[in-house]
Amino acid sequence: MHAIMLKAKLHRAEVTHAVLDYEGSCAIDGDWLDLSGIREYEQIQIYNVDNGERFTTYAIRAENGSKMISVNGAAAHKAKVGDRVIICAYAHYGEAELASHKPRMLYMAPGNQLSHTSEAIPIQVA
């Protein structure tokens, strides 16, 4: 059995740039790519918390320490500067990998400050 699982997530990052006339992609602070395990040119899903848009693009590296999230190309129609987004990467895992799989999640505070990291989402209670 194989399953598609969450590999990495940047939770509630703020869009810092939306550049329509740029080759399509999403530039992400290189430190965050390294910490999350998201690779350059890897497919990512972006969920816009502020307007409900959901779209697919690929990650490119922004300058380390820049705190940049730049939504580029046609995707710039889906997010504006200041929007809060969730950026996710998914991967296929075999049955042997599933038992030990833990996603890498980065949680952002206002101003794209890294709040904390986690490998699990708390159980939701009523």
Swiss-Prot record:
Catalytic activity: L-aspartate + H(+) = beta-alanine + CO2
InterPro entries attached to this UniProt entry: Asp_de-COase-like_dom_sf, Asp_decarbox
GO cellular component: cytosol
Post-translational modification remark: Is synthesized initially as an inactive proenzyme, which is activated by self-cleavage at a specific serine bond to produce a beta-subunit with a hydroxyl group at its C-terminus and an alpha-subunit with a pyruvoyl group at its N-terminus.
Subcellular location: Cytoplasm
Regions crossing the membrane: none
Amino acids binding substrate: 57, 73-75
Record GO terms (molecular function): aspartate 1-decarboxylase activity
GO process terms (BP): alanine biosynthetic process; pantothenate biosynthetic process
The keyword Metal-binding is annotated on this UniProt entry: no
Cofactor binding, per record: Binds 1 pyruvoyl group covalently per subunit.
Residues annotated as the enzyme's active site: 25, 58
Pathway it works in: Cofactor biosynthesis; (R)-pantothenate biosynthesis; beta-alanine from L-aspartate: step 1/1
Cofactor(s) in the UniProt record: pyruvate
Residues with the Pyruvic acid (Ser) modification: 25
EC number, UniProt record: 4.1.1.11
Keywords attached to this entry: Autocatalytic cleavage, Cytoplasm, Decarboxylase, Lyase, Pantothenate biosynthesis, Pyruvate, Schiff base, Zymogen
Record's subunit section: Heterooctamer of four alpha and four beta subunits.
Family per record: Belongs to the PanD family.
Entry function: Catalyzes the pyruvoyl-dependent decarboxylation of aspartate to produce beta-alanine.
PANTHER family: ASPARTATE 1-DECARBOXYLASE (PTHR21012:SF0)
Record-given protein name: Aspartate 1-decarboxylase
Organism per entry: Pseudomonas paraeruginosa (strain DSM 24068 / PA7)
